Amino acid sequence: MPSKMTNFGKFAIVDSGVKIDVDLSRFNKQYQKAQYGLDGDVMTSMIPFMPMQSGIFVDVTRAASASVQGTGKVYAAYGPAGQFLYKGKVMVSSVTGSTWARLGEKKVLVSQYSGQTKAKEDLSYNKTAHPEAQAYWFDAAKTRDINKWVKNVKKNAGGGKRG
């Protein structure tokens, strides 16, 4: 469902004694539809590049994005594992250096850990479910699908006839 975002309204231009009333509010629905579609297209485009084992991470991220769809926000990575999965970096307990941390224990990047750890710096993604899985998957999706996104936005916003 599109958000209640207002892009344009009514305004007046006065120049040299001439007053022009302009009402662009009729475009709001088109732009809301375009934004809603773009947000959905971005999320859908990212999925093949996201790491997936059980599917929970992808599903949680998709649900979080769906909850804000139409606002111009898309979650590329949601939940506690999101940051390190998106950046492709291993995080360890700041206390023990283990990849497992106790409840409430802060996790840091391997490069920020002051002690010794056997953890590797970079994540290695399982590519069984998603062969194109990689870090920074929004960028990969954007590189592949930006032209499709623009075409759909133009179409939904009412300007798609000219390309």
Residue ranges and their predicted role:
Residues 23-54:
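Charged, well-structured alpha/beta interaction segments
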Residues 2-13, 33, 47, 54-163:
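Charged, low-complexity interaction tracts
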Residues 22-23, 129:
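General secondary-structure edge motif
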Residues 13-16, 20:
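Small-xxx-small helix-packing motif
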